[in-house]
UniProtKB/Swiss-Prot annotation:
It holds the Pfam family RRF. The keyword Protein biosynthesis applies. The lineage of its organism: Bacteria, Bacillati, Bacillota, Clostridia, Eubacteriales. Responsible for the release of ribosomes from messenger RNA at the termination of protein biosynthesis. May increase the efficiency of translation by recycling ribosomes from one round of translation to another. CDD domains: RRF. This is Ribosome-recycling factor. Belongs to the RRF family. It comes from Clostridium botulinum (strain Langeland / NCTC 10281 / Type F). GO terms for cellular component: cytoplasm. Keywords: Cytoplasm, Protein biosynthesis.
Amino acid sequence: MIKEILKKADEKMGKTIVALKRELASMKAGRANPAMLDRIEAEYYGSMTPLNQLGNISIPEARVLLIQPWDKSALSAIEKAILKSDLGLNPSNDGTVIRLVIPELTEETRKNIVKTVKKTGEEAKVAIRSIRRDCNDDVKNLKKDDVSEDDIKKAEDDIQKKTDKYIKEIDSIISAKEKEILSI
C-alpha cells in the first residue's frame, strides 16, 4: 500500500516537471523555438487545430520561424491565429510560407519574462507540495489499516525526500531558463 502511494507521488511530481518544461518552452526568450507556437490553434475546416498539425515549422535562422502549411488554404487561418495570440509577433505571409521574425528583447521585456518564469516555477513548487500533502494524508489514513507508526514515519520521510528532489529540479530548471533569457 505504501509503495503505491510513493509510486503515485513520483508519477504526479514527474508530470508536474514535464508540464513546467512545456510551459517554459513556450515562453519566448529572444530566439526562435517551435514550442512557442504549441499553444496556438488555427481554425481549419471548422475545427481548432494546433499549428504543428497544419504544417512544418522550421528555424532557418536564429530568430526566424518558418511555417510551411501542407495545405496552402490554411495560410490565412494560421496568420490570423498568430495575430490573435499573446506572442506579439507579426507574421509575414508570402503566399506559400509564413515567416515569423522574433524581435530582440528589450531589458524591460527580459525582466518581465523572468518574473513570469519565476511565477511559473513557484506554481510548480506549490503543485509539488500539494502532491506531498495529499500523499501524506493517504499515508496517515493507513493507520486504520494496522500499518505501524515506524512504517508511516518512513513513508512520510520518503515522500519528503521526493519533494525535496523535485523542488531542487524545479529550481535548476528555472535558473537555467533565467540564464537563457538574460544572456541573449
